[in-house]
């Protein structure tokens, strides 16, 4: 049986035991993660997602992709050349299980990308100054 999952803006066709290179996830090596955005699993096709389906995986390592070099040269300007390189950060995951139902009750943490913002804790409001303290500061 196979599934099609979506993570990092890309879609992957996976089976149990497959090793994938996906966009960087907030997980350490050895952690178990769960992909909840399943577009298709077995013969069930979602519209757009299959309800209750999930793909579980184990994080193997965080790696960097091959370097992509960009070379910029502007005509008619002497010594106006620039070389830049970029290495995309990736996470290696091994698919362990395909769940058609009950993915929301499995207890495994969901796979979250590195750029996803987590809501900050609510900070307590500062105590307001009394009128006497405020007027004392204005006098100084």
Curated annotation (Swiss-Prot):
Pfam families recorded: Ribosomal_L21p
Renumbered residue ranges of the record's region Disordered: 106-140
GO cellular component term, pick one: ribonucleoprotein complex
UniProt record, GO biological process: translation
UniProtKB keywords: Ribonucleoprotein, Ribosomal protein, RNA-binding, rRNA-binding
Gene Ontology molecular function terms on file: rRNA binding; structural constituent of ribosome
Record flagged with keyword Chaperone: no
HAMAP family referenced in this protein's UniProt entry, alphabetically: Ribosomal_bL21
NCBIfam families attached to this UniProt entry: L21
Known partners and oligomeric status: Part of the 50S ribosomal subunit. Contacts protein L20.
Function: This protein binds to 23S rRNA in the presence of protein L20.
Stated family: Belongs to the bacterial ribosomal protein bL21 family.
Protein name in UniProt: Large ribosomal subunit protein bL21
Species of the source: Paracoccus denitrificans (strain Pd 1222)
Lineage, uppermost ranks: Bacteria, Pseudomonadati, Pseudomonadota, Alphaproteobacteria, Rhodobacterales
């Amino acid at each position: 049986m196979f599934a099609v999952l979506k993570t990092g803006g890309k879609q992957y066709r996976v089976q149990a035991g497959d090793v994938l290179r996906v966009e960087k996830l907030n997980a350490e090596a050895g952690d178990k993660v769960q992909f909840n955005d399943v577009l298709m699993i077995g013969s069930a096709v979602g519209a757009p997602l299959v309800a209750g389906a999930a793909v579980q995986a184990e994080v193997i390592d965080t790696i960097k992709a091959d370097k992509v070099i960009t070379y910029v040269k502007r005509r008619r300007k002497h010594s106006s050349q620039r070389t830049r390189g970029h290495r995309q950060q990736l996470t290696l995951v091994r698919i362990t299980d395909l769940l058609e139902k009950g993915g929301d009750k499995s207890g495994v943490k969901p796979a979250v990308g590195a750029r996803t913002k987590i809501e900050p804790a609510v900070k307590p409001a500062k105590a307001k100054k009394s009128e006497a303290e405020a007027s004392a500061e204005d006098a100084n």
